[in-house]
Regions:
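Juxtamembrane interface at the ends
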Residues: 161-162, 166-167, 238-246
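C-terminal-most transmembrane helix of multi-pass membrane proteins
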Residues: 269-270
């Protein structure tokens, strides 16, 4: 079976699982708790291959998964804010443990440990902020439309950028880090996303899924934010891999590489979407 077929099958299954997972809050939580764990495990495994680095892979992964579930519990109104105390204790432990580990460069261990939480676990956890919101009656409601739309915009951007870049690409976007990306592709991808955002607004209005109450221009703004920060997220992961001297972050997804390869764009796009939507509430 050639790589194109493998990549296509993996991609279709990936999209199907992700879309299905968003339809139910329990399924979403379970799916992204797993994705968070696999991603933190992958990240810590990669940095541990660097000379002098020895991050506690198991505890970092457990901490990342716990943080995701804690944010989910808090955002859904199931648990109080005290749910974060065990996570904070774990972070303190990971810092103090370096005093006794006698590693040659504890600063690197601290930095990579915190990066596994800030760069990987935190963005995935912010999906809960997008999915759960307080209702007028005092209860907490779940809506899949915004978190799912973030991923739809990222997929549309990838496809649009690839098509436009292949046909029109002449000016390199960031040749030092990602030689294959062009300005033409990035702009084309952004235009596709803006059109897709208008489509999401129309369909959500028609079928009653626009729980967040965004108008068409606010949806288009969200699409633009996701496009810009998604592109930066892609470039950040490319820089990370170049620094480590690797092509793919892993091989868990046949034809697509590792978890970080598949979710790189979302790691900056999700927090940016949260900030954008919060900013709208202040205007």
């Amino acid at each position: 079976m050639n790589n194109f077929v493998v990549r296509t099958i993996t991609g279709v299954l990936f999209v199907a699982v992700l879309v299905t997972g968003f339809l139910d809050p329990i399924a979403m939580s379970a799916l992204f708790a797993l994705i968070t764990g696999l991603s933190v495990w992958e990240f810590t495994g990669l940095v541990n291959n660097r000379q002098g680095v020895s991050v506690n892979r198991f505890i970092s992964t457990v901490a990342g998964v716990y943080f995701f579930l804690a944010v989910m519990g808090f955002c859904s109104g199931v648990t109080p804010s005290t749910v974060f105390i065990p996570y904070l204790i774990t972070i303190v432990y990971l810092m103090v443990a370096e005093l006794y580990a006698k590693n040659e460069d504890p600063i690197h261990d601290w930095a990579y440990t915190m990066m596994s939480q800030m760069y990987v676990a935190l963005p995935f956890s912010m999906l809960n902020v997008l999915a759960f919101r307080a209702m007028p009656d005092g209860n907490v409601g779940y809506s899949f439309i915004v978190p799912l739309s973030v991923f739809v915009f990222l997929w549309v951007n990838d496809s649009g950028a690839y098509c436009c870049g292949s046909l029109l690409g002449k000016h390199k976007l960031f040749p030092r880090i990602s030689p294959g990306k062009s300005w033409e592709g990035s702009i084309g991808g952004g235009l596709f996303v803006i059109a897709a955002a208008a489509g999401v607004w129309y369909l959500s209005e028609q079928y009653g899924y626009n729980d967040v109450g965004l108008n068409m221009y606010e949806w288009m703004g969200l699409g633009l934010v996701v496009t810009v920060f998604g592109t930066w997220g892609d470039l950040v992961e490319s820089l990370f891999k170049r620094t480590l001297g690797i092509k793919d972050s892993g091989s868990i997804l046949p034809g697509h590489g590792g978890m970080l390869d598949r979710f790189d764009s979302s790691l900056l796009a999700i927090p940016a979407a949260v900030i954008y939507l919060y900013t709208l509430t202040l205007l």
